[in-house]
Amino acid sequence: MTYNPFSLSGKTVLITGAASGIGRATAIECCRMGAEVIITDINPDGLEETFRQLPEQNGTHIRIVADLTKEEEIESLADRLPRLDGCVNNAGIMKLVLTPFLTTEIIERIQKINLIAPMMLTRNLIKKKKMKNPSSIVFTASAGGVFRVSAGNGIYATTKCGIDAFMRTTALELGGK
């Protein structure tokens, strides 16, 4: 047997926002590294396409359609999950809106999925003891939110800075456990 420090063999990983983009790529790569994955997204067609692309050699993969902007769906998702070795909080949206055109509706929509959803999912996973010890919780932030700014990117950048701060705080709180 060859030692592979990047192996996820025997691990179970939840990936949110898995219907496309970074979430889809993460799910496929986790499978290639040996993990069984649980993928979730609000988009059933995209989720099904991701599911079809998953390598089958690692056992049973699960797909769950969920709207993570709704707290009751986050709680239901957490209840359905087995104990996890990892969670990739990836679900998110980007919408460029110049400051004079921001509305409360736009701000709340982006905040709900980019900031509140990963915070509430993480809280539920911890409270319901769904994370194994040791385990990993990953958050998708953005250089566009943390290191540089661009016109129309104010609310997106704000949510990504917020999730970066939440990640650091959560790591501090849970790191010694």
For every predicted segment, state its role:
Residues 1-11:
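Flexible N-terminal pre-Rossmann segment of NAD(P)-dependent oxidoreductases
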Residues 11, 83-84, 128-143, 176-177:
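Active-site loop of short-chain dehydrogenase/reductase
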Residues 19-20:
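Conserved glycine-rich cofactor-binding loop
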Residues 91-96:
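Conserved NAD(P)H cofactor-binding loop of Rossmann-fold oxidoreductase domains
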Residues 98-111:
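Substrate-binding pocket helix/loop in short-chain dehydrogenase/reductase
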Residues 122-123, 168:
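A short, exposed helix-loop element centered on a Lys and neighboring polar residues
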Residues 138-162, 167-168, 172-175:
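Catalytic loop of short-chain dehydrogenase/reductase
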